[in-house]
Amino acid sequence: MVGKIDLRYVKTRTALLIGCLLQVYAAQAGKLSIVIDDVGYRPHEENAVLQMPTAISVAVLPNAPHARLMATRAHSQGREVLIHMPMAPLSKQPLERDTLQPSMSSDEIQRIIRNAVNNVPYAVGMNNHMGSAMTSSLPGMQKVMQALESYRLYFLDSMTIGSSQATRAAAGTGVKVIKRKVFLDDTANEADIRRQFNRAVELARRNGSAIAIGHPRPATVKVLQQMLPSLPADIVLVKPSALLNEPQGNGGGYVP
């Protein structure tokens, strides 16, 4: 009887020790978050993204014809949904409807963000679509942060410009700001995308966390389908909100 009790004791202690070791390992693993932008225009192609692990999040364009559908599908799977908000770029090009601009009043920005929240149900955060002119404007981004605070949304800075004012603008508000470290698909070349994916993994390993942004393009989807199943054991996929309290550093640098 004593032997049996001792054996159960050993088994229990061993299980507890293994559990503790797994918790420590998970805490030390590099955290990688992947967000797929520009969702809401091509449900057939975008459905391939919804076949990936549910830690992969989607950023939905608020005025896209299938915005509500794709946000709802993603949320029903337990995915994190962001609003992919059009913001004014530095380059001179035609602007999409309801593109946020530095010259807009607080009321106008509030109206646009309110509509976006209505069009993209279940959103818990927002990131910028283009936006180098808007995100580099401190007054403009302060208006954005005031609006986001009222909806309790975080802001993922896509870092389309190195002089982004998003973090400064959020000071004094309840809005958390996180930063993109890697763009996966600046090109449609699979080798380039694979290289960028590996870079994101290495940054997550070195810095403790990293956020990569990609798009629902065939080459990107193909590379992710190939590489996600063989993600290194010391890297864990997480949703962006899991990184809200992680050090953000300087982001991923300027991309035109």
What are these regions (language model features)?
Residues 2-18, 25-256:
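Catalytic-site microenvironment of enzymes
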